[in-house]
Each structure stands twice: as structure tokens, then as C-alpha cells.
Amino acid sequence: MPVPRSRHDHYPRDDAARCRRIREAVAKLDAHWCSADTAPGGLFAAIDAVADQPPDRVIARLLPWLADTGWLTARLGEALALLAADPFARPPLRPVGGGDGGSGGLILAERGAVRIALHIHPAAAAAPTHAVFVPGRAAIRVLAAAGASLCLHQVTVSAAEEAGGFTASAAAPCHSAPPRALADGEILHLDTARQSYSLTGAQGDVLLLELTVQPPTPLPIRSYDLASRRLAQVSASQRDASFRTMALTLLRHLGRPDAAPLFAEATQAGDFALRWHAMRELIALAPAAALPRLTAMATADPHPEVRRAAQATLALYPKPSPSGEGSETCQLAG
């Protein structure tokens, strides 16, 4: 059965020749960029040369790519030329963020733990209410300050927490510095496990070129409420764990009980935030299937807060009656 087309859908899918030209033009530009990036002196080659270095060293070695943005100007010019030739072409630049009118951007390069991205903070974006701390290092060049004020946020993280001993109950509060003017051309250096920032008062769109290094770590991503300065949420920091988190949520929304083994497997992952997220989603999807893993988690999970959460959730399960009724299904508020 054909899918009805939106009146806003003007993509020329019925023009086979034009669609072929679009695909060929995009593929040609992608191949050109890949060739330039992997050649000696190219961006990928520069990243690969420091792949085994500590994050601070990686940042230092790649800073020239922030200082001289001629390569970025050329790349955006080629992307615009592709769009000028056909507005339905999609330049080979992966978008990130931008939902609900918030900040978004384009990923310019990503190799292992290293990412270089162009970020836009719209002038009309809502005032930030949370500060997010993502383990790693970052260097951020301000391409257009647009009159914005910068507020830096800081939180203390101990060596034990970085090594895998983080608990929400012992998390330090967040502290914010007084706002200051953001300046065109300045470069911010952040230990993003402990430092974050927010922007306010911009008179136009703020444009940032951001270099981040986020190697695998047991320390989770932490979101703090700026009003109370208290920890509001934790989530998996490792990218594969983050992708699995999103995939499990999607499977639960799709109502796929046949995928329960994937959820059960994730409840034994190394990342405690992923383990508990998978458990919650499995309970919402298939409570009976979740019960054996929840029982094991309540007694043997290596993280104390996951054990306590599992024990509290286990107490919500109805006790089976002597006849066995009520032992197979139950309703739990998610």
C-alpha cells in the first residue's frame, strides 16, 4: 500500500535521473573529503597520529585545526556549492542536536574518541536549566560570540569516582561562576568531567568550533539542576552504551517482547547506568521476563545503588498466591 505523501514533500523521487545525479554528487564530495582527510597532513591523519595519547596531549596536538579554520571555510563552501547545484542534495556532514530549537550542529570529523564539530547556539534558545558533565577534555574556539555571556559550571570528582566508584548519593554539588562576556576568537579549555558551561543573552546565533576527546570511562554523564545545584540525572558515558540505551528504549516503545534477551544481556553490561536502564525498560516491556534478572540484580549487582533500586522495585512485584495466580504478570508504574 503506497504511503500518502505530505504536501510539504517536494523531493523529486519520481525523477530518477535527478536523484541519481544527487547521489553521485554527494558521493563524489564525500570521497573528496575522505581522500583529503586521510592524506598526509589531513584531518583524519592528524587524529590517527595521536590516537594513543592522553586526552590533554590529543587536544594540544590538534589545536592548530581550531586556530586556522581555512579548511573549515573551504569545506563549508563546497557543501554550499553542492546545495546550490541542487537544493535537495544533502552534504555528507552528520547533524547533531538541534531539537526543540536548542543548540545543534554538524560533525566535521569523528575518529574513535575524538570529535570535531561545529555548534550553533540559536539566539532564541531557551535559557539553560541544567549543566551536563561529560567525561573527557574539550577545546572550544568561539567563531561568533554574538554578545553572549558565558557561565562556567564546576563539580568536584574524586579519583575513586573516576575509577568506577561513583554514586548519586555521594555526588558533589555543582557550583557556577559569575557570567562573563564571551569573546570572538577565544579558546576555552575544559576538563568536561568537572567543567561545563552555558550561554545566555546572545544577540544572535553563537557559533563554536569544538574539539572533544572522550575516551572510555566508568564515570557516567551527569546532569545537574542549576537552580538547586543538585545532581538530577546520570546516564551512560561510553558511546556504545549510550547507543544501546537508545536502542532498548526504542524496542520498548515498539512493544517488542521478542527482544527481551537483548534487554537481559544489557542488564549485565559493565556500565551501571546501562544496566539499570535496561532493567527498567525490560520491566516495562515484559515484567514476568524481567523478574529473574531483577532478583539477581537485587542481590549481586556490583553497584550499591543499582542493588538498592532493584530491591525496591522487586518489592513492588505482587506476591504469588498459594494457588499460583498473579505470579506471571504484574503492572508496574514506570
Predicted regions and their residues:
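Alpha-solenoid helical repeat architecture
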Residues: 235-236, 251, 266-270, 298-302
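Short, conserved beta-strand element in jelly-roll/cupin
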Residues: 135-155
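Structural detector for internal amphipathic alpha-helices that build alpha-solenoid repeat scaffolds
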Residues: 244-254, 276-285, 308-318
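Amphipathic alpha-helical scaffolding segments comprising HEAT/armadillo-like alpha-solenoid repeats
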Residues: 225-232, 256-267, 288-299, 320-331
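A short, N-terminal "cap"/entry segment at the start of jelly-roll beta-barrel domains
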Residues: 2, 10-114, 226
